[in-house]
Regions:
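Positively charged n-region of N-terminal signal peptides that target proteins for export
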Residues: 1-4, 113-115
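Intrinsically disordered, low-complexity regions enriched for glutamine and histidine
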Residues: 3, 17-18
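Sec-dependent N-terminal signal peptides
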Residues: 7-8
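N-terminal signal peptide c-region/cleavage motif recognized by signal peptidases
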Residues: 13-15
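Subset of outer-membrane beta-barrel
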Residues: 19-317
């Protein structure tokens, strides 16, 4: 039964035309994956590593892990001289006997709206290598037309993304974006692959619960993510408590899917976060499998260059 479910799962995401975007619990620390307009908005050079194990302990009959596994490396930074931000993401997403290796490059033009607000206009380019190892399947019926591939087969897909990112100084952010805009198509074995277009709305706020001395500051940081492929809609709502920008923790809810816990520690320019999804009981009788996710990173703040004040002699005006 597990092998059958794994096969159905793989081809639901690949052979049946739908390539879904990757799901992350720590979306509030991984904004660039969802919205290219957010790159450089932290005014820091940030390098982040993330690993997610979906459905912990889910294996096939041979004991092989067929649950989704995701590894991600991201870098982004502001480029003040051209009022912009740039970013790059490399990731691998494994699902059963399917592997996706992708690169996303992002650029954002940052416009100042008054002294406290900036608006980012972003665009991104993505390259995806999708492969399926047909040799690992054990079909119940020889000659199954869905499993006629030989060995590992792959295809390359290119696509684009775009977004808007409004941000005030530390307090508030709001982003709208679309990924996989052109819905690129490819063929692996007998199956046509289509990258589904996704729409995202992300927002968050930093509210000071206690102000005062540096060592006593406490902030409430709620955030909200809505995603849709035009047919289905999913949302996450999360609340974090941040103690002096050093320790933080909280919880969240993913609609009809999971509740999750998040904890993090920041030491100087380094940070590490851990989240754990507690999957809600399924109505279809499938056993519950939880999902851990860990992120580590380094952020070095960059200050915009200070303009030198010029003085003019009125004689030459």
């Amino acid at each position: 039964m597990r092998r059958f479910y794994a096969i159905v799962l793989v081809f639901f995401c690949s052979g049946c035309l739908a390539q879904q975007d990757i799901q992350f619990t720590q979306y509030m620390f991984n904004k660039a994956f969802y919205n290219p307009a957010s790159v450089g908005s932290a005014n820091s050079i940030c390098v982040k590593l993330l690993m997610r194990q979906q459905w912990l302990g889910f294996k096939d009959d041979a004991g092989l892990t067929v649950a989704p596994q995701t590894y991600l490396l991201s870098v982004d930074a502001p480029v003040y001289v051209i009022h912009s931000g740039v970013g790059a993401i490399i990731y691998q997403d494994k699902l059963g006997y399917e592997s996706n290796i992708g690169i996303r490059l992002s650029y954002a033009l940052r416009l100042h709206l008054g002294e406290d607000n900036t608006l980012g206009l972003g665009a991104g380019f993505s390259l995806l290598n999708k492969s399926i190892d047909f040799s690992k399947f054990d079909p119940r019926h020889q000659g199954d037309p869905m499993l006629t591939g030989q060995g590992s087969e792959f295809c390359y897909l290119t696509d684009f993304s775009a977004g808007l990112w409004l941000q005030s100084r530390r307090s508030f952010y709001l982003g709208l974006s679309a990924t996989q805009i052109r819905q690129a198509r490819g063929v692996i074995g007998p199956s046509e692959i289509v990258l589904k277009r996704y729409y995202y709305l992300m927002t968050g706020y930093n509210y000071a619960l206690r102000k005062g001395h540096t060592e006593r500051q406490i902030f409430l940081e709620p955030s909200f993510l809505v995603s849709s492929d035009g047919e289905n809609i999913q949302f996450d709502v999360t609340g974090l408590i941040n103690f002096n920008d050093q320790y933080y923790g909280g919880a969240g809810y993913r609609f009809q899917n999971a509740v999750y816990l998040i904890a993090g520690l920041k030491f100087r320019k380094f940070f590490v976060n851990l989240s754990y999804d507690i999957t809600l009981p399924a109505s279809n009788g499938i056993s519950r499998h939880d999902s851990p996710e860990i992120m580590a990173g380094y952020c070095c703040g960059l200050s915009p260059p200070v303009r030198k004040q010029s003085f003019y002699n009125t004689r030459f005006l």
